[in-house]
């Protein structure tokens, strides 16, 4: 069980670090194209900017429309996150992870369910 956890973490952490680094590189390149430095205030050379962006995202206030259905308004993004994590669990990482013969069909089926999350988000705002 511990080996499976470490194997999964060893797969997910480098992917997340690569996404953070590529986002930083993209922002730096866009800054240089606009004749400015890009993110450079957070940490040396702006290397901690993705961490600051993630922290800022976590502390943002959630705004709910006044006439929105609260249950559907909050459960739709949770459904989307659940489906995304479920899709990640199908990817074979080691010997003891999920490995189906019909995993492509399962991926297509689960990804088609994300439409209901978007539909619920729009419907819950009553607009």
Curated annotation (Swiss-Prot):
PROSITE patterns: COMPLEX1_ND1_1. GO terms for cellular component: mitochondrial inner membrane. Keywords: Electron transport, Membrane, Mitochondrion, Mitochondrion inner membrane, NAD, Respiratory chain, Translocase, Transmembrane, Transmembrane helix, Transport, Ubiquinone. It holds the Pfam family NADHdh. GO terms for molecular function: NADH dehydrogenase (ubiquinone) activity. It is found in: Mitochondrion inner membrane. Belongs to the complex I subunit 1 family. Core subunit of the mitochondrial membrane respiratory chain NADH dehydrogenase (Complex I) that is believed to belong to the minimal assembly required for catalysis. Complex I functions in the transfer of electrons from NADH to the respiratory chain. The immediate electron acceptor for the enzyme is believed to be ubiquinone. This is NADH-ubiquinone oxidoreductase chain 1. The lineage of its organism: Eukaryota, Metazoa, Echinodermata, Eleutherozoa, Asterozoa.
């Amino acid at each position: 069980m511990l080996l499976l956890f470490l194997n999964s973490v060893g797969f997910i952490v480098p992917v997340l670090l690569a996404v953070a680094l590529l986002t930083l590189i993209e922002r730096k390149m866009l800054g240089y194209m606009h004749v400015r430095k890009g993110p450079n205030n957070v940490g040396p050379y702006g290397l901690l900017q993705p961490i600051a962006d993630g922290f800022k995202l976590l502390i943002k206030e959630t705004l709910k429309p006044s006439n929105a259905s609260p249950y559907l308004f909050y459960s739709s993004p949770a459904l989307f996150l659940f489906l995304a994590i479920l899709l990640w669990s199908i990817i074979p990482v080691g010997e003891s992870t999920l490995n189906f013969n019909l995993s492509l069909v399962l991926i297509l089926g689960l990804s088609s369910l994300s439409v209901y999350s978007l539909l619920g988000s729009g419907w819950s705002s009553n607009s």
